[in-house]
Amino acid sequence: MEYEYPIDLDWSNEEMISVINFFNHVEKYYESGVTAGDFMGAYKRFKEIVPAKAEEKQIFNTFEKSSGYNSYKAVQDVKTHSEEQRVTAKK
């Protein structure tokens, strides 16, 4: 599916790619499953770019409106698994 990713035009190209990569991991979590370590690595990089909780919440809400995927719930679920575990959304 195609979504509009919440991108800040003040970010560098590398930062934009990293944020999109994180949201790709959120998509995989909901669609086919993702390794917890890979997901959390992408989230850690996302947090380097977006360290403020308020901004993170705003970006997550924008992505959820576009995709229907709740990034916050994905992060909270993946955090409860070991790095090598494959995690997918509960249906």
From Swiss-Prot:
Pfam families: UPF0223. It comes from the Bacteria. InterPro entries: BH2638-like_sf (IPR023324), UPF0223 (IPR007920). Belongs to the UPF0223 family. HAMAP family: UPF0223 (MF_01041). This is UPF0223 protein SAOUHSC_01044. It comes from Staphylococcus aureus (strain NCTC 8325 / PS 47). The lineage of its organism: Bacteria, Bacillati, Bacillota, Bacilli, Bacillales.
